[in-house]
Design a protein with these regions (language model features):
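Short helices/loops that flank or line small-molecule/ion binding pockets
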Residues: 74-88, 174-190
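Periplasmic-binding protein-like
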Residues: 110-117, 127, 201, 205-223
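Ligand-binding cleft/hinge of the Venus flytrap
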Residues: 52-62, 132, 144-146, 150-173
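N-terminal hydrophobic or amphipathic helices and topogenic motifs
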Residues: 1-75, 81-85, 101-106, 126-131, ...
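Short loop->beta-strand "edge-of-pocket" segments that line small-molecule binding or catalytic clefts
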Residues: 35-46, 132-152
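Acidic, polar ligand-binding/catalytic clefts
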Residues: 87-117, 122-123
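Flexible hinge/capping segments at coil-to-helix
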Residues: 111, 120-141
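A ligand-binding cleft/hinge motif common to bilobed small-molecule-binding domains
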Residues: 89-101, 182-212
């Protein structure tokens, strides 16, 4: 399957592309080089599935050099729209994805599906069960940054339920990854956070309360 996909997309074998050695601080130089070569720029936040995909693409005999730019869903699509990336990894509904890349013919591939839900301390001492619990004045949350899927998911819920973000304790505490919000719960800096399931299990100190299954898309411009 890997060979047929490579030939169908017109990708040359890795041996035909020699990527110059750039110093660590020159990631922008590497990005610009790959944008104008046979390399690949992929934007998306960390996930085990995405890391596995990138590693396999890089080591496959007909693979290509891949540079991952760590961005949330919104910023990944923004980069795709302005041609600063070849692939955006986004976990939004199709209508939102297409609205953020207007006038561009897109191809979408569902890479995987995952559970989004609540991170809570082991044993769930506050007996949290859903996002409505965030409105309780005694509950402090660790929030994600604007443009990330957990933040968009939470903001859509608050809007639909006519709940003011100002009433949510910790709403303006913005962290930039699911790992960091999970760590905030594990270290008792907050009571709960919303995020992808894998991060809850890494510390061994948290329980995960699933709320919904979401798709993770690879979004590409159709040539």
């Amino acid at each position: 399957p890997g060979n047929s996909g490579a030939s169908a997309s017109g990708i040359s074998p890795m041996s035909s592309l020699q990527v110059p050695e750039f110093p660590p601080e020159s990631s922008l130089l590497k990005r610009d080089y790959l944008l104008h070569s046979s390399g690949l720029i992929l934007c998306g936040q960390f996930s085990p599935a995405l890391e596995l995909l990138i590693s396999q693409m890089s080591i496959h005999p007909q693979g290509i050099p891949v540079l991952q730019s760590f961005m949330n869903s919104y910023n990944s699509l923004y980069s795709l729209y302005f041609k600063k990336a070849h692939i955006a990894c986004a976990s939004l509904d199709l209508e939102h994805i297409r609205s953020l890349v207007p006038g561009v013919q897109l191809s979408l591939l569902c890479l995987y599906e995952y559970s989004i839900g609540l991170y809570v301390p082991s044993g769930n001492p506050l007996k949290l069960s859903g996002l409505m619990d965030f409105a309780c004045k005694d509950i402090k949350i660790a929030n994600r940054e604007k443009g990330s899927t957990p933040r968009i998911y939470l903001d859509q819920f608050l809007f639909s339920e006519k709940i003011s973000p100002a009433s949510i304790s910790g709403y303006h505490t913005e962290l930039v990854s699911d790992i960091s919000t999970a760590a905030a719960i594990a270290t008792h800096k907050a009571d709960s956070a919303l995020g992808e399931e894998y991060a809850a299990h890494q510390s061994g100190l948290l329980d995960f309360i699933p709320l919904q299954t979401l798709p993770m898309y690879l979004v590409m411009e159709t040539e």
